[in-house]
Amino acid sequence: MIVKQARTLKEAVELLSQYESSKIIAGGTDIVIQIYEKRIHPKALIDISKVDELKKIEEKDDYIEIGAGVTYTDIMESSLFEGNLKGFKKACSLVGSPQIRNRGTIGGNIVNASPAADSIPPLIALESTLILVSKRGKREVKIQDYFSHGKTFGIREDELLTAIRFRKPKGVLTFAKLGLRKALAISRISISALVDLDEDNRVIFVRIASGSIGKLPMREYEVEEFLHGKVFEENVVDESVKVLQESMDKRLAGRPTLPYKRRAIEAVLKEALSEVRQ
């Protein structure tokens, strides 16, 4: 296996086009394990850990753009993710150990495409756009399409994820997850909610995204539809849990994990929604 170090974005894209069956390595927290366990067999590794262009967090008018090489720790230390974007900071703070948060990148979390990836539900709730670059040019893909349509929208062999962009939300972004332990926990189930309330405490905007419920992280459209326009009260939150449970019953019918996940989702969804007011 060949290992090549890229110093610029242009060089990284050139190397990707030059070597077939190549893989990108940035933080290495996932891909090194995959190679060691012989789950993947790349002919070349393109190291982008020195590409400074991918390590920026930028505020652009109504948007925030996160470079694919930004680490979880970078997000936690950025003042942009205070206030109504606290849910993204919380999701990043719950990833693995300090060592993993210092090395692991947001771009790697997306491209690795684990259903348990903590950073993805908040980015789905924010309706983020992924910026993919190759020698053929630039392509923009909605993150929900990237996960829900598989090969149609998924990253191509010669493409590099360079950035994640989303519009600054008016509502509050939250995140909650259930793992098997307090630290180093891989999510068994997670929820991110983006909710905006009017002066009468009525839901005027809502996005709900889940992780680890099924094979892919996804929007929970039925819960969104139920919550929209309702006064944000405890009984409404309770009913939204039932809506999500009924949706899970259809999606996970016959799966042995359904009874556990059906019970667990109540606490996770309630925690995510309760943080809207905090």
Spans of model-derived segments:
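C-terminal structural segment of proteins
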Residues: 1-278
